[in-house]
């Protein structure tokens, strides 16, 4: 735990400097001394946009920034954000180099749908890896009488931070159960940690958070408060029918958060994306470093154990960066 927080602190210290618009130097290829010279990325800056406190993105992103800084000699930092929706906007606006994002949010961003419908501008971005799966956590206090999504009607519910993928997906889950987030609940928009704190303190009745396993805010809450995780199995087909085939049944295993049974949630893939113009040589170097350092990343967060060559190309609804395709072809895993 001490190593984890030291990594996060070190990478976040320089993140503020990366919030200004990125220069083209960060995404265009450096001049080579000769055609045979190996790319040298020393001194290049990389701003990795992640998520909020208590979630997986910020932890994983901080670990990735640490690894890339050490192995590629770049100046990589992890910037805390509301998460997916804002991350795609930061890519679009030239303020980020790599972004963690949900697959459904990425699709909307590229195609000008949902939160990216006009007058919002589309995002020109490409996937470089499918990282791991997200699980929609819907959390209430045990014994509260909230046992189904329908029971949230009229309740105080945090549906995720404004600008997060949790917010978008949470609204869709509610909709699948016939609930309008603007009318049928008392919505609040808090990040994972603030949501967990608010539930513990009786300020909300339930909260949504879409994250990997384990999500630290939920783990910490479960250690002090008896919680109930809400099943969403009936939502998945309805969400896919309306929004696209992004969602799948994802089980939170028994015991993850002291839960007595497996809980079926609406799952979605997490992507690592870059601007379409991103330097191809650097894409390949980042991917090689990520896979070479998978064991180190897994020490930062267990979800990094799911970073695998044979699954990193599966489940992205947006195109892969050409250099990423070349990388995966060189490893014999590109099947598309």
Positions of predicted regions on the chain:
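Pocket-flanking alpha-helical
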Residues: 60-66, 77-119, 193-198, 213-222
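A ligand-binding cleft/hinge motif common to bilobed small-molecule-binding domains
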Residues: 100-117, 171, 175-178, 206-247
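Short, low-complexity disordered leader/linker segments with a strong preference
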Residues: 1-44
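Extracytoplasmic
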Residues: 43, 55, 73, 83-86, ...
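A structural signal for short loop-to-beta-strand junctions that line the ligand-binding cleft
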Residues: 118-131, 136, 254-264
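A bilobed periplasmic-binding-protein/Venus flytrap-type ligand-binding module shared by bacterial periplasmic
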Residues: 132-146, 265-281
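An extracytoplasmic/periplasmic, membrane-proximal ligand-sensing/linker region
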Residues: 43, 187, 194, 200-202, ...
